[in-house]
Amino acid sequence: MGSDSSFTGASSNVAEYSVSEISGALKRTVEDTFGHVRVRGEISGYRGPHSSGHAYFALKDDRARLEAVIWRGSMSRLRFRPEEGMEVIATGKLTTYPGSSKYQIVIEQMEPAGAGALMALLEERKRRLATEGLFDPAVKQLLPFMPRVIGVVTSPTGAVIRDIIHRIADRYPLHVIVWPVRVQGETSGPEVAAAVDGFNALPDEGNIPRPDVLIVARGGGSLEDLWGFNDEIVVRAVAASHIPVISAVGHETDWTLIDLAADIRAPTPTGAAEMAVPVKADLLATLAGQSARLSSAMSRFIDLKRQAHRSAARALPSADQLLALPRRRFDEAAARLTRALFVNTQKKRVHFDGHARQLSPRLLQRRFTELQRDVSALGQRLPRALEAFLRERRTAFIHRANRLSAEPILRRTKLTSVAIEQLDRRRDQAVRLLIERAKRRGQELERLMRTLSYESVLERGFAVVFDEEGKPVKQAGSVSAGDALSIRFRDGEVAVVAGDEDESEPAKLVQTKKVQSPGSGNQGSLF
């Protein structure tokens, strides 16, 4: 009983707190005691800023772990991008979170814990990316000799962009497109990577021209200042770029991972501009020199060809010498053809005249006269036409011969001779066809004459009466008593005297004479 009362008395001397009160008192004590501290540790569990802009991670060493938070305002003021495993020195204040009885550091400033830690992280990242082939020289692209458009990824307000534009304008003015980015701080790496990807995404024929080469540039600075260009996302974007990239980050002694991933590294931004474009004055001077050498070479070449042509021309015979013999043969053939055509026409004309004289009927005579006239006209036209044709061919032949070498001329002469022979054969064939046609027509007229002649009627037993003048008597009323008549029979003629109807006198027989038939031998055959 005594012990219980003593325990009660002791408990009454200790202040009583609620959970909230003790948590608040602890929070105030921690914040008052550790209101401004610097903590060195390794970043653990870093996943980048939250959607709200705040970042939550932890600082640890080999024996303890301290939760940390960076609010959005402080995050934007960091000069580098925090990464997993990076050793840093964080400046801020300790506080507690009553809801879970945890304490944490609210970081206001943070910096890498010395260059050694950053270099170790940089070397480890360099080895890892190198094993993936991102720095392989075999995948490097060549810079275009004369780009049309240059894309520049840098800060729009620094001296770097002014130096680049000024240098390009001095050497070879062209179109420059600037993609503004932050070149320092937490967001510099993602912005540079987005700019490189954005330039590559431009279409070839879009409203914004697609650059032929990219320059990623920044002025000099410390390792922490340039840390955004060691960001893995930047290295991968530059390595995957289809547009050649020139890295111009920092001074000549500075280096970053983007220098290894780029197609070429420039010591300075001004040097990058000089690598990107040639000197226009040098190009013009080179072009003028090459043009002069080309003109001189062409002049020498033309002179050599002219001399060779003249030498070859002196070795060849003249055109008159080459054409003398073919021209003579051609003239002789033309003369023979004209004479042969004239002689042949005369022979045919005499032949037609002979046959025409043997045909007595006027119809046949007139037809033969027409045929003779047609043949004569044809004979007159053919020499003129042939002469005109030969003259035209001779003129064309001479005109072409003046431009041709000996071999084509000889070949053409041979073809002309063959053509003349063909014309000769065609002429003979045409004359033969005319003769055959006239012969057939004469035979048809002869058969027609025999059919229509009165002598064929005499063969059937009829007779024909002629008056004293030898004209046929067509009507009995035209004959008077006492008129001397002759009656022609098939085999001869009988002389009679016309008498009255009442008295008649025996007719005196007169010596009959054979009437030559059209087919008698004295007349001869037409053909």
UniProtKB/Swiss-Prot annotation:
Top-rank taxon, per record: Bacteria
GO CC annotations, alphabetized: cytoplasm; exodeoxyribonuclease VII complex
Main location: cytoplasm
This protein's UniProt keywords: Cytoplasm, Exonuclease, Hydrolase, Nuclease
Subcellular localization: Cytoplasm
EC number: 3.1.11.6
Polar residues bias locations: 513-527
GO BP annotation list: DNA catabolic process
Chain segments carrying region Disordered: 499-527
InterPro entries (UniProt xref): Exonuc_VII_L (IPR003753), Exonuc_VII_lsu_C (IPR020579), OB-fold_nuc-bd_dom (IPR025824)
Catalytic reactions of this protein: Exonucleolytic cleavage in either 5'- to 3'- or 3'- to 5'-direction to yield nucleoside 5'-phosphates
Pfam families: Exonuc_VII_L, tRNA_anti_2
One of the record's GO molecular function terms: nucleic acid binding
PANTHER family attached to this UniProt entry: EXODEOXYRIBONUCLEASE 7 LARGE SUBUNIT
Family membership: Belongs to the XseA family.
Summary of the function given for this chain in its UniProt record: Bidirectionally degrades single-stranded DNA into large acid-insoluble oligonucleotides, which are then degraded further into small acid-soluble oligonucleotides.
NCBIfam families per UniProt: xseA
Subunit structure: Heterooligomer composed of large and small subunits.
Protein name per UniProt: Exodeoxyribonuclease 7 large subunit
